[in-house]
Amino acid sequence: MSTYVSSVFSLATMKQNPLKRKRNDEITEEKVVLLMAMHKEDDEHQHTKPSPPSWEILCLVGPYMDPESLAVASCVSTTWSKCFSSEDLWKSLPATRHSIFAKAITKEGAKPAWLSYKRLISEAESAAKRRRNNQPAEPKISLSDLVFIVHVSAGSKEAVVVKQGKDLVFGSNERFQIEADVRDSGFTADMKDVSMSWNVVLRNYERMFLMSETVIKSLDSMIGWFTDELPGTKNRYCDGSNLVGEVKPSFNEDVLDKVVFAIADSRNWKSLFVDDVLRYLQCFLVD
């Protein structure tokens, strides 16, 4: 019998037999009901709130939490308070976060009996936070945003020196100063009533600030000068009411070679660092 004849015979036989076998993947009414029940059960699980963790688990988590999280967790409930206020738990924190206090409290009688480790760590964390909050913010401007203009005149002699901030290089612990080369202007040590001014300009001359303008009664190769107080600011990190312009002359024999300008604090007569100068200047150059 050929393959074609066999196929036709089999098809005819199936048509004559109404009780054919069901396929395993055939969707019956029973399967539909079962699928609906399973979907409903899954949906109920998705909308059911998870049960809170056991208090034993909470105690295991405690040693891995930071002091701030522990303090917040201890206020959630009575059970949480017992877990996260344990003296043994808080006692381990000084050694890892505040080594100075850890060394102090190990000494006999250093910690009063009434003082809990939780209170001790809370005070230490608060002190550290206050310290961080009192740190000055980064300046909004940089030296590359600024141009410094120094003007020196006496009688018919005059010198104008322009310094681009981008060309100035300072070390991390170096104090700010501007050096103006006036060697070719003919200023001599015996000159009287020498006028000096120091201007700062924001990029592309968007804003200008007259830092200092003064008249030096007599050039003297032995000493420097201080200008009047600089304009005050409301910047708590750099109080302009205590700042003065500092001028240091440099002579080559009797000829004025260079003039160095800086900003000094009149309380200790020390020049300011670069970032402090930028914080001061931004009060006048940036809205």
UniProtKB/Swiss-Prot annotation:
<dbReference type="InterPro" id="IPR001810">
    <property type="entry name" value="F-box_dom"/>
</dbReference>
<dbReference type="InterPro" id="IPR036047">
    <property type="entry name" value="F-box-like_dom_sf"/>
</dbReference>
<protein>
    <recommendedName>
        <fullName>Probable F-box protein At5g04010</fullName>
    </recommendedName>
</protein>
<dbReference type="Pfam" id="PF00646">
    <property type="entry name" value="F-box"/>
</dbReference>
<feature type="domain" description="F-box; degenerate">
    <location>
        <begin position="50"/>
        <end position="101"/>
    </location>
</feature>
